[in-house]
Swiss-Prot record:
The lineage of its organism: Viruses, Riboviria, Pararnavirae, Artverviricota, Revtraviricetes. Residues 1174-1320 form the RNase H type-1 domain. A zinc finger (HHCC-type) spans 1387-1427. It holds the Pfam family MLVIN_C. Belongs to the retroviral Pol polyprotein family. This is Gag-Pol polyprotein. Keywords: Aspartyl protease, Capsid protein, Coiled coil, DNA integration, DNA recombination, DNA-binding, DNA-directed DNA polymerase, Endonuclease, Eukaryotic host gene expression shutoff by virus, Eukaryotic host translation shutoff by virus, Host cell membrane, Host cytoplasm, Host endosome, Host gene expression shutoff by virus, Host membrane, Host-virus interaction, Hydrolase, Lipoprotein, Magnesium, Membrane, Metal-binding, Multifunctional enzyme, Myristate, Nuclease, Nucleotidyltransferase, Phosphoprotein, Protease, RNA suppression of termination, RNA-binding, RNA-directed DNA polymerase, Transferase, Ubl conjugation, Viral genome integration, Viral matrix protein, Viral nucleoprotein, Virion, Virus entry into host cell, Zinc, Zinc-finger. The keyword Zinc applies. One of its GO terms (cellular component) is host multivesicular body. Its cofactor is Mg(2+). The gene is pol. PROSITE patterns: ASP_PROT_RETROV, ASP_PROTEASE, INTEGRASE, RNASE_H_1, RT_POL, ZF_CCHC. Residues 561-631 form the Peptidase A2 domain.
Length: 1738
C-alpha cells in the first residue's frame, strides 16, 4: 500500500547521526558513501552470506570481519572502521535496531551428537577427581504457549524477539514452580548467564529459579552441554592477584586445580588459561611434564607417540563433549595437565633455600612450619608429610626457629622421642610466653642499671686501691729521704753500729749469728734491690715519675712523651721502645763509659712551629727522655733562667706545651685516642680490632674475586701526559703515595695507558690529597647499569618502630676490592721520586677512586657479602648506601647485639669502619645528611646553616648553587616549586640576570621556610598513605601523610610545576594533572603501598570520563593507567585544604561539578555553533589551497558563495594549507562584521581551532607541550580576534571534494576552485613590488589618522569625496600605516638596502602614492635585526691618540712576528719599539713563548735602557701567560694589553714589523742570501736611521747626533774633521735633551691633554659586536649587548669579559639620543676589582 520495505542498510542511512555517534564511540570515523558501497557492493563478494541490503546477524558480521582483518594482501584495512561499526550496532543495538537483531542462541554442540538423558536427582553429588557431576534441575518448566492471547498484539517489537521463535523446552510435570505460579512463556532453553543477570534486573526474582553459573561447559535445560568462555576480568584477576609460576608454583598450581574442578574448561579453555597465567617457557615445561605422565595399558609411563597424542594432544582434538567418551577424554586431559603442573613446579634440590627459611620475629611456630614444609616440597624431592622425613623436618624446625625458641627446644628432655607435633606445641607455649616489648625494655633498663652500678663499685674499689698504693709508696719515699738526710748530718762512711763477736746482725741479740737467727725468714734469696730508691720501674711509662724541671711534653708518633730539656745533649733521646729501629747506630760516651745505640726511624713530632720528622737515639739506660739541641733548634726554643727556675718558651715568647700531672694520672697519656662519637671508656675498639681502620689497617674483601674491567669495542689506550705540579703539591701528596706503596695498593708498572694525577688541597689546611683524572678512561670502559640505592627513598625501608640506630662509615672502601692484573694497567699514572728511586708509572691493585663504575661495583659486592647477615638477623634493619651503613633496632639491647654482630661480620669479611665517624647505639644519629630521631627525619642544623649562610646570589651560577642546596630540603618545604618560581628563569643560559623584589622575596621565603622546617615521619610501609593535593596557577602542591592515632603525620611535602600544556587547562583539569604528577613522585616513597588521594575536586569522575576536547589520547591513557589502579590508588571524599599546611579544614568548602565547569569552558565564543543559522545574512564557503607546481609551492585562499567569488588572494610561496585555511576563514569573519553569518569550511584544522583548540592555545600561552611557540601563531590570534566581529556566527564543517548537487557541495567546490585559480594566476616579473587592487589595500579600507591628514595638507593633497580618499599627483594616497606594512613586507622578502629598494620602487608602477615613503623605508632598513647582524659596516671611529713615553726607554711596544723561511731553527722575530724615540730592538728566536720574552727583557733591554715603566702588547699567549705577568708585577712594570683583533692598537710595533720584513726581503734579493738572521743588523740600522714624523731619526733622538757614516783614511783629513772633547760631547747631549726630548714630550702630552672623543657610545647603549671568526651561514655581528664601561677607544659590554675596540662595534639603533638628565653613581663592591654603577636622575 505504498510502503517501502525497510532494510538494515536503509535503516542505518535513516539514522545516520546515530551511526556516526556509534563510530565515534569506537574511535573511528565513517563516510556515508563508502558505507553504502561496502555494504551493497563489496561485502557480498566475500561469499559469506552477506546480503546487499545488509544484516545484523552476528555470525555473518563475524565472517566479514575475519575477511577484512585478514593479514597480508588479502586484508582490507580501509574497511575496518565500517565493519567495526556494523558489529557495534549488532552487539549493542540502539532502539531502532533491536527489532532486526537476531537473538543470540546459546552455543550448542553439533546436533548430530546424541544428547544425554537427564540424570535422576541425587541428594549428594557423586565424587569426582576433577569436578563435581553436573545435574539437571529438579523442576522443569512447562511448555509455553506458542501464540499469545488473542486480545494482544501478534508481536511486540520493543519487548519480544522477532520470529523465528526458539524451540520450546521440555514440559514440567505440573506446569508450575514451587511457588505455584505458571512458568513464564519463554520456550527456549536456559538463556546465557548474562541474559539471566540482565533479566534479573527487570523482573522480580522467582523463588524456584535455578542459579546459573558462568562455567565454560555446563549442562543445559535440554540435556545438551552449553559453552560459556572465560571472562576477561577473571583471567585478569587470576593473573594479577597471584604470583608467577616461577616464583610460587604451588600457589598457582592450586589455583589452576580449583579452576579445573569448578569451571570444567574445555581443551581450548585450558590453552587459554595456560597462555594467560604462564610464560611461554613455563607452558612448554608443563606440557612436557604432562606428556611424560601419560600411562600405557600396563599402567606405566609410555613412550608411544600415538598413545601420548591421544591422551594429551598438543593440537585441538575433535572430542564430542556431549558423549561420555568425549567427556572422559577431557577428564583425563585435565588430570594429566594437573600432574604436569605439579611435576614442573618442582625446583632442583637446593637445601640452602630450605636453610634460608627462618622464623620471623612475630611469626607463630605453626605458620613457620607451613613455610618450612612448603620449602621442602619446592626445593627438595622429599615429602615433609612422609614419616621417614619427620626427623629432618623436626631438626630444621628447631635450628631455624627464633633464637629464644630454638634454644629452649634444644634443652627439652627426651628430645629424640618428640614428634613434630610435640615440638610445635612446645614452641607455641614458648611463643605465647614471650615477654612483651614493654617487659623487654624494662628488663634491659634494669640490667643496664645493674651493670652501671657494678661498674661504679669497681671504679670506687680501684680508686681506693690506687690511693692505698700511693700512700704506701710515698711513705717509703719519705722514709728513705729522712734516713739519707740523717746519715748526711752524721757524716763519715759508717753504715751501721759495731757488732760484738757473738751479736746477731739481724735481730741484734747476742748468742748467735745472723745465719742462725731463728727470726730470719727462710727461703730463696730474692734479687738485690736497686741502689736508686727514687727510680721506679718505667717500662712502658706506667707510674714513672716525671723528669725534673725544666720539662716539656711533645707528641711523638701520636703518643705524648715528657722530655727533660738538656742543652748539653747533642741529640734527643727516647728510652722506651719506639717501634722499628733503623740500621744506623751511634757511639754514646757517658760518665761510666761508652756504648753503641741505634737510631729510630723517622717519627713525626708535633712542635709549636708545626709538624716535623725527626730521628731519635734509642737509649734504654737513660733515666729520662732527653730533648737535645737538635730538636730545640727546630723548636726555636728560648731558655730563660729566673728565680723560680728555668723557663722554656717558643719563638714568640709563648710557653711551650708543658704538662704537669700526678703520677697516678700518668696512664691517661698512654691511652689510645678514640673518635669523638665512640663513648669514652668503651670496649668497641678493643673487642673488634679487625673491624676498625684505626686498629685493623687497610681492608681487603676476602670473599670477592678480583674485578675485570671490560672495555668498549674498538677502544684504544689513551696516554695523557702528567700536568705540571708545584713542589709544594708534590711534597704534599708524597706521603700518601709512599703509604699506598707500602701497603701494596700502588705498584710500579709499564702501561700504554696514562692519565694525570691532580693534587687537590684540602680546604682549611695545607694538606694535599692525590686525585686521578680518569675521565678519558671512563669514556673507553663499558657502562654498567647503576644499582646504587636512591637516597631519596632509601629511608622508606626504615620503619618508625626501630628507633635505636648505629651508623658506620667504611674507610677507604673502594680499596677493599682487588683489581685483576689484566685491568690494572688501565689506571696507570706518572710518578717520580728520586729519594724513593721511582721514575716511571704506578698503577692501582685495588679499585680506584674516580672510576665511574666504582660505586656500583662496591655497592653490589658489599650487598652480596652482607646477605647472610640480613638473613641471620631478620629483626634488624640494615640500610646501605655505597659505604654508609645504618643499622636500626627496636631496643638498645638488640641494637648493641646487632652492632657487635655487624662489626664482627665486617671484620671477618675484610672491611674496615672509621671509628672517628662511628655513631653506635644512639637514638639520634646523622645519616646521609638527615637527622634521624624517634622514627622521624629532620634537617640537620649544618644543612640549614649552609643554606642560611649563602649570600644573595649575584650570578646565575651562584643562584643554581643556592637552588641545588635548598632543593635537597624541598621535602620539608610546602610548595617549594611555587616559592622558587621567580628564581628559576634567571638560571637559564642567555637570560639577563636581574635580581628584583620578586626574587628577593622568594629568596627570603625559602630561607624562612627552612628555619621552620618540620619533622617528617619515616614512611611506614605497613600503613596506607594519604596524599592531599592542591593546585594553584600551574603549580602542584601536596603533602603525603600517614595516620598516627587520630592525627595525620606528614611524611613529605611535594611540589612541582605543571608542563605548559597542562598549565593552560581549566582548574579542574589542572587538578587532574597535579594529582598525576604528585602521585608519581609519591610512589618513590610509598613503594607501591595503597594511596588515598584527597583533593578539592571530584577528580575520579573526570579521569573516568575525561573531556576529549582538552586531553590527547596518549595523555588520557597515561592518567587513567596511573590513577585508576584501584589496587593501589583510591580517591577519598572531596576536602577543602588549608593553603598553609595543605591539610583539610574542619569546615566544608563550596562544592562544584567539574564536568559542568569544563562544559562551560570549552569554547572561545559562547554562542558559537556548528549548526546553520536559519536567519543568516550571508552563507559563505572558505577554502585554502597549497600545492606544488614546477617545484614551487603555491598557495591561495578564497571566500565564495555557491556561485560567485567574494574574496580571493594568492598567498606567498611556501604557505601551508593549514595557514591558508586560517587566512580564508579569518577574512570571511572580518568581512561579515556586525552581520549574521553561516560559514562552511572543509578544514578540520580551522574548524577545531575556532571551536575548541583556540581556547586551549590561548590558555596555555600559544605554546606547545615542549614549551615552544605553536605554528601559525599570528593567524590563530587573528582568527580568535575575528570570531567576535559577526553579530551571530555559525562555523560548519563540510566534507571536502564532494560530488553532487547539494548546496554544501557546490559551495565547497566553488571555494576550492577559486583558491587554486588565484594561486596559479600568472603575475608579471615585478609582481613583488606591485599592489593588487583587491582588499585590504583598497580605498574602502584606507583609514587616515590625524598625523596623516596633517602631512597630506602640508604636501598639498586634496580629498576626493567621490573616491572617499586623498589624492596626490593623480593617485590615491596610501596612509602611513599601510605604507609601513607594505614596505616592511617587501623588505622582509628581499632585505635590500634603502637605496636599492627605493630605486626599484621608482622604476615600478604603483596605482597609489605612498605617504612618507622614503622616511618609512629608511626606518625599516635601519631597524631590521637580520640586516644589522649580517651587513658589513664601515667603522665610523675617528683616529685616537697614542700614549707615548716621556723619555727614551720608559714605554715599549712588543710583538712577535713570523719570518719564513726559518734558518737554523729561527722562525720568529721579537721586536721592541720605544714609543718615545722610535728606537727598535729585534731578536731572532726559535719559539714564541713567555720565557723568551722575559729573557730578552731582563738580559737585553734592562741592562742597556733601564727598567721600563710601561709595556704594551697584544693578547698573544706569550704576553698573557702567568710567567710574563708575574715578572712584570715583581719588577713594577705596567703591562698593558691592547684590544683583540685590533692591530692599530699596537700600531707602532706593527708598522715596524712591516718595515723590517720589507727591508729583509729587499736585502735577500740584493745579496742572494736567504740567511735573514745575518742581514738583520742592516735592517735594524735602516730602521733606526729613518726620520720620523718630526724629521728626526731614532738614533738622533737617542744620541743627539747622526751616526758616523764615513771613515777618512787620510790622517790629515781626519785632523780637519770636527773632533770634540768628551766634555763638549756631554754638553751637546745636554743641549739635545733640552732641545729635542722636551719638545717631543710636550708635543705628546699636548695630544693627551686635548683628546678627541673617538666614538659616541655611552654607558647603557645597546651595540652589536663584530664576530671575528664566522662560520658558514653565521651572522657577522652578534648581540645586541649593553655597554657597561667606556674608554676613548674601547668598550666593556655585558656578557663579554674582554675589552672591545670601538671600531668593532656598531649601534643597535643608529639614532643616538641626546644626553639625558640622568647621572651615574659609582659604588664600591666587596670585590676590589669590581665596581657597581647605578643611574639616577640629577
Amino acid at each position: 500500500m505504498g510502503q517501502t520495505a525497510t532494510t538494515p542498510l536503509s535503516l542505518t542511512l535513516d539514522h545516520w547521526k546515530d551511526v556516526e555517534r556509534t563510530a565515534h564511540n569506537q574511535s573511528v570515523e565513517v563516510r556515508k558513501r563508502r558505507w553504502v558501497t561496502f555494504c551493497s557492493a563489496e561485502w557480498p563478494t566475500f561469499n559469506v552470506g552477506w546480503p546487499r541490503d545488509g544484516t545484523f546477524n552476528p555470525d555473518i558480521i563475524t565472517q566479514v570481519k575475519i575477511k577484512v582483518f585478514s593479514p597480508g594482501p588479502h586484508g582490507h584495512p580501509d574497511q575496518v572502521p565500517y565493519i567495526v561499526t556494523w558489529e557495534a550496532l549488532a552487539v549493542d543495538p540502539p532502539p531502532w535496531v533491536k527489532p532486526f537483531v537476531h537473538p543470540k542462541p546459546p552455543l550448542l554442540l553439533p546436533p548430530s551428537a546424541p544428547s544425554l538423558p537427564p540424570e535422576p536427582p541425587l541428594s549428594t553429588p557423586p565424587q569426582s577427581s576433577l569436578y563435581p557431576a553436573l545435574t539437571s534441575p529438579l523442576n522443569t518448566k512447562p511448555r509455553p504457549q506458542v501464540l499469545p492471547d488473542s486480545g494482544g498484539p501478534l508481536i511486540d517489537l520493543l519487548t519480544e524477539d522477532p520470529p523465528p521463535y526458539r524451540d520450546p523446552g521440555p514440559p514440567s510435570p505440573d506446569g508450575k514452580g514451587d511457588s505455584g505460579e505458571v512458568a513464564p512463556t519463554e520456550g527456549a532453553p536456559d538463556s546465557s548467564p548474562m541474559v539471566s543477570r540482565l533479566r534479573g534486573r527487570r523482573e522480580p526474582p522467582v523463588a524456584d529459579s535455578t542459579t546459573s553459573q558462568a562455567f565454560p561447559l555446563r549442562l543445559g535445560g535440554n540435556g545438551q552441554f552449553q559453552y560459556w568462555p572465560f571472562s576477561s576480568s577473571d583471567l585478569y584477576n587470576w593473573k594479577n592477584n597471584n604470583p608467577s609460576f616461577s616464583e610460587d608454583p604451588g600457589k598457582l598450581t592450586a589455583l589452576i586445580e580449583s579452576v579445573l574442578l569448578t569451571h570444567q574448561p574445555t581443551w581450548d579453555d585450558c590453552q587459554q588459561l595456560l597462555g594467560t597465567l604462564l610464560t611461554g617457557e613455563e607452558k612448554q615445561r608443563v606440557l612436557l611434564e604432562a606428556r611424560k605422565a601419560v600411562r600405557g595399558e600396563d599402567g606405566r609411563p609410555t613412550q608411544l607417540p600415538n598413545d601420548i597424542n591421544d591422551a594429551f594432544p598438543l593440537e585441538r582434538p575433535d572430542w564430542d563433549y556431549n558423549t561420555q567418551r568425549g567427556r572422559n577424554h577431557l577428564v583425563h586431559y585435565r588430570q594429566l595437565l594437573l600432574a604436569g603442573l605439579q611435576n614442573a613446579g618442582r625446583s632442583p634440590t637446593n637445601l640452602a633455600k630450605v636453610k634460608g627459611i627462618t622464623q620471623g620475629p612475630n611469626e607463630s611456630p605453626s605458620a613457620f612450619l607451613e613455610r618450612l614444609k612448603e620449602a621442602y616440597r619446592r626445593y627438595t624431592p622429599y615429602d615433609p608429610e612422609d614419616p621417614g622425613q619427620e626427623t629432618n623436618v623436626s631438626m630444621s624446625f628447631i635450628w631455624q626457629s627464633a633464637p629464644d625458641i630454638g634454644r629452649k627446644l634444644e634443652r627439652l628432655e627426651d628430645l629424640k622421642n618428640k614428634t613434630l607435633g610435640d615440638l610445635v606445641r612446645e614452641a607455641e607455649k614458648i611463643f605465647n610466653k614471650r615477654e612483651t616489648p614493654e617487659e623487654r625494655e624494662e628488663r634491659v633498663r634494669r640490667e643496664t642499671e645493674e651493670k652501671e652500678e657494678r661498674r661504679r663499685a669497681e671504679d670506687e674499689r680501684r680508686e681506693k686501691e690506687r690511693d692505698r698504693r700511693r700512700h704506701r709508696e710515698m711513705s717509703k719515699l719519705l722514709a728513705t729521704v729522712v734516713s739519707g738526710q740523717r746519715q748526711d748530718r752524721q757524716g763519715g762512711e759508717r753504715r751501721r753500729p759495731q757488732l760484738d763477736h757473738d751479736q746477731c746482725a739481724y735481730c741484734k741479740e747476742k748468742g748467735h749469728w745472723a745465719r742462725d737467727c731463728p727470726k730470719k725468714p727462710r727461703g730463696p734469696r730474692g734479687p738485690r734491690p736497686q741502689a736508686s730508691l727514687l727510680t721506679l720501674d718505667d717500662q712502658g711509662g706506667q707510674g714513672q715519675e716525671p723528669p725534673p724541671e725544666p720539662r716539656i711534653t711533645l707528641k711523638v708518633g701520636g703518643q705524648p712523651v715528657t722530655f727533660l730539656v738538656d742543652t748539653g745533649a747533642q741529640h734527643s733521646v727516647l728510652t722506651q721502645n719506639p717501634g722499628p729501629l733503623s740500621d744506623k747506630s751511634a757511639w754514646v760516651q757517658g760518665a761510666t763509659g761508652g756504648k753503641r745505640y741505634r737510631w729510630t726511624t723517622d717519627r713525626r713530632v708535633h712542635l709549636a712551629t708545626g709538624k716535623v720528622t725527626h730521628s731519635f737515639l734509642h737509649v734504654p739506660d737513660c733515666p729520662y727522655p732527653l730533648l737535645g739541641r737538635d730538636l730545640l733548634t727546630k723548636l726555636k726554643a728560648q731558655i730563660h733562667f729566673e728565680g723560680s727556675g728555668a723557663q722554656v718558651v717558643g719563638p714568640m715568647g709563648q710557653p711551650l706545651q708543658v704538662l704537669t700531672l700526678n703520677i697516678e694520672d700518668e696512664y691517661r697519656l698512654h691511652e689510645t685516642s678514640k673518635g669523638p662519637d665512640v663513648p669514652l671508656g668503651s670496649t668497641w675498639l678493643s673487642d673488634f680490632p679487625q673491624a676498625w681502620a684505626e686498629t685493623g689497617g687497610m681492608g681487603l674483601a676476602v670473599r670477592q674475586a678480583p674485578l675485570i674491567i671490560p672495555l668498549r669495542a674498538a677502544s684504544t689506550p689513551v696516554s695523557i701526559k702528567q700536568y705540571p705540579m708545584s713542589r709544594e703539591a708534590r711534597l704534599g701528596i708524597k706521603p700518601h703515595i709512599q703509604r699506598l706503596l707500602d701497603q701494596g695498593i700502588l705498584v710500579p708498572c709499564q702501561s700504554p695507558w696514562n692519565t694525570p694525577l691532580l693534587p687537590v688541597k684540602k680546604p682549611g689546611t695545607n694538606d694535599y690529597r692525590p686525585v686521578q683524572d680518569l675521565r678519558e678512561v671512563n669514556k673507553r670502559v663499558e657502562d654498567i647499569h647503576p644499582t646504587v640505592p636512591n637516597p631519596y627513598n632509601l629511608l622508606s625501608g626504615l620503619p618508625p618502630s626501630h628507633q635505636w640506630y648505629t651508623v658506620l662509615d667504611l674507610k677507604d672502601a673502594f680499596f677493599c676490592l682487588r683489581l685483576h692484573p689484566t685491568s690494572q694497567s688501565l689506571f696507570a699514572f706518572e710518578w717520580r721520586d728520586p729519594e724513593m728511586g721511582i721514575s716511571g708509572q704506578l698503577t692501582w691493585t685495588r679499585l680506584p677512586q674516580g672510576f665511574k663504575n666504582s660505586p656500583t661495583l662496591f655497592d653490589e659486592a658489599l650487598h652480596r657479602d652482607l646477605a647472610d647477615f640480613r638473613i641471620q638477623h631478620p629483626d634488624l634493619i640494615l640500610l646501605q648506601y655505597v659505604d654508609d651503613l645504618l643499622l636500626a633496632a627496636t631496643s638498645e639491647l638488640d641494637c648493641q647485639q646487632g652492632t657487635r654482630a655487624l662489626l664482627q661480620t665486617l671484620g671477618d669479611l675484610g672491611y674496615r669502619a672509621s671509628a672517628k665517624k662511628a655513631q653506635i647505639c644512639q637514638k639520634q644519629v646523622k645519616y646521609l645528611g638527615y637527622l634521624l630521631k624517634e622514627g622521624q627525619r629532620w634537617l640537620t642544623e649544618a644543612r640549614k646553616e649552609t643554606v642560611m649562610g649563602q649570600p644573595t646570589p649575584k650570578t646565575p651560577r651562584q643562584l643554581r648553587e643556592f637552588l641545588g642546596t635548598a632543593g635537597f630540603c624541598r621535602l620539608w618545604i610546602p610548595g617549594f616549586a611555587e616559592m622558587a618560581a621567580p628564581l628559576y628563569p634567571l638560571t637559564k643560559t642567555g637570560t639577563l640576570f636581574k635580581w628584583g623584589p620578586d626574587q628577593q622575596k622568594a629568596y627570603q621565603e625559602i630561607k624562612q621556610a627552612l628555619l621552620t622546617a618540620p619533622a617528617l615521619g619515616l614512611p611506614d610501609l605497613t600503613k596506607p598513605f594519604e596524599l592531599f593535593v592542591d593546585e594553584k596557577q600551574g603549580y602542584a602542591k601536596g603533602v603525603l601523610t600517614q595516620k598516627l592515632g587520630p592525627w595525620r603525620r606528614p611524611v613529605a611535602y611535594l611540589s612541582k610545576k605543571l608542563d605548559p600544556v597542562a598549565a593552560g587547562w581549566p582548574p579542574c583539569l589542572r587538578m587532574v594533572a597535579a594529582i598525576a604528577v604528585l602521585t608519581k613522585d609519591a610512589g618513590k616513597l610509598t613503594m607501591g603501598q595503597p594511596l588515598v588521594i584527597l583533593a578539592p575536586h571530584a577528580v575520579e569522575a573526570l579521569v573516568k570520563q575525561p573531556p576529549d576536547r582538552w586531553l590527547s589520547n596518549a595523555r588520557m591513557t597515561h592518567y587513567q593507567a596511573l590513577l585508576l589502579d584501584t589496587d593501589r590508588v583510591q580517591f577519598g571524599p572531596i576536602v577543602t585544604l588549608n593553603p598553609a599546611t595543605l591539610l583539610p579544614l574542619p569546615e566544608e568548602g563550596l562544592q562544584h561539578d567539574c564536568l559542568d565547569i569544563l562544559a562551560e569552558a570549552h569554547g572561545t565564543r559562547p554562542d558559537l555553533t556548528d549548526q546553520p543559522l536559519p536567519d543568516a545574512d550571508h552563507t559563505w564557503y572558505t577554502d585554502g589551497s597549497s600545492f606544488l607546481q614546477e617545484g614551487q609551492r603555491k598557495a591561495g585562499a578564497a571566500v565564495t558563495t555557491e556561485t560567485e567569488v567574494i574574496w580571493a588572494k594568492a598567498l606567498p610561496a611556501g604557505t601551508s594549507a593549514q595557514r591558508a585555511e586560517l587566512i580564508a576563514l579569518t577574512q570571511a569573519l572580518k568581512m561579515a562584521e556586525g552581520k549574521k553569518l553561516n560559514v562552511y569550511t572543509d578544514s578540520r584544522y580551522a574548524f577545531a581551532t575556532a571551536h575548541i583548540h583556540g581556547e586551549i592555545y590561548r590558555r596555555r600561552g600559544l605554546l606547545t607541550s615542549e614549551g615552544k611557540e605553536i605554528k601559525n601563531k599570528e593567524e590563530i590570534l587573528a582568527l580568535l580576534k575575528a570570531l567576535f566581529l559577526p553579530k551571530r556566527l555559525s562555523i560548519i564543517h563540510c566534507p571536502g571534494h564532494q560530488k553532487g548537487n547539494r548546496a554544501e557541495a557546490r559551495g565547497n567546490r566553488m571555494a576550492d576552485q577559486a583558491a587554486r585559480e588565484v594561486a596559479t594566476r600568472e603575475t608579471p616579473e615585478t609582481s613583488t613590488l606591485l599592489i593588487e587592487n583587491s582588499a585590504p589595500y583598497t580605498r574602502e579600507h584606507f583609514h587616515y589618522t590625524v598625523t596623516d591628514i596633517k602631512d597630506l595638507t602640508k604636501l598639498g593633497a586634496t580629498y576626493d569625496n567621490a573616491q572617499k580618499c586623498w589624492v596626490y599627483q593623480g593617485k590615491p594616497v596610501m596612509p602611513d600605516q599601510f605604507t609601513f606594512e607594505l614596505l616592511d613586507f617587501l623588505h622582509q622578502l628581499t632585505h635590500l638596502s634603502f637605496s636599492k629598494t627605493k630605486a626599484l620602487l621608482e622604476r615600478s608602477y604603483s596605482p597609489y602614492y605612498m605617504l612618507n615613503r622614503d622616511r618609512t623605508l629608511k626606518d625599516i632598513t635601519e631597524t631590521c635585526k637580520a640586516c644589522a647582524q649580517v651587513n658589513a659596516s664601515k667603522s665610523a671611529v675617528k683616529q685616537g691618540t697614542r700614549v707615548r713615553g716621556h723619555r727614551p726607554g720608559t714605554h715599549w711596544e712588543i710583538d712577535f712576528t713570523e719570518v719564513k723561511p726559518g734558518l737554523y731553527g729561527y722562525k720568529y722575530l721579537l721586536v721592541f719599539v720605544d714609543t718615545f724615540s722610535g728606537w727598535v730592538e729585534a731578536f731572532p728566536t726559535k719559539k714564541e713563548t713567555a720565557k723568551v720574552v722575559t729573557k730578552k727583557l731582563l738580559e737585553e733591554i734592562f741592562p742597556r735602557f733601564g727598567m721600563p715603566q710601561v709595556l704594551g702588547t697584544d693578547n698573544g699567549p706569550a704576553f698573557v701567560s702567568k710567567v710574563s705577568q708575574t715578572v712584570a708585577d715583581l719588577l713594577g712594570v705596567d703591562w698593558k694589553l691592547h684590544c683583540a683583533y685590533r692591530p692599530q692598537s699596537s700600531g707602532q710595533v706593527e708598522r715596524m714589523n712591516r718595515t723590517i720584513k720589507e727591508t729583509l726581503t729587499k736585502l735577500t734579493l740584493a745579496t742572494g742570501s736567504r740567511d735573514w738572521v745575518l742581514l738583520l743588523p742592516l735592517a735594524l740600522y735602516r730602521a733606526r736611521n729613518t726620520p720620523g714624523p718630526h724629521g728626526l731619526t731614532p738614533y738622533e733622538i737617542l744620541y743627539g747626533a747622526p751616526p758616523p757614516l764615513v771613515n777618512f783614511p787620510d790622517p790629515d783629513m781626519a785632523k780637519v774633521t770636527h773632533n770634540p772633547s768628551l766634555q763638549a760631547h756631554l754638553q751637546a747631549l745636554y743641549l739635545v735633551q733640552h732641545e729635542v726630548w722636551r719638545p717631543l714630550a710636550a708635543a705628546y702630552q699636548e695630544q693627551l691633554d686635548r683628546p678627541v672623543v673617538p666614538h659616541p657610545f655611552r654607558v647603557g647603549d645597546t651595540v652589536w659586536v663584530r664576530r671575528h671568526q664566522t662560520k658558514n651561514l653565521e651572522p657577522r655581528w652578534k648581540g645586541p649587548y649593553t655597554v657597561l664601561l667606556t674608554t676613548p677607544t674601547a668598550l666593556k659590554v655585558d656578557g663579554i669579559a674582554a675589552w672591545i675596540h670601538a671600531a668593532h662595534v656598531k649601534a643597535a639603533d643608529t639614532k643616538i639620543e641626546p644626553p639625558s638628565e640622568s647621572t651615574w653613581r659609582v659604588q664600591r663592591s666587596q670585590n676590589p676589582l669590581k665596581i657597581r654603577l647605578t643611574r639616577g636622575t640629577s
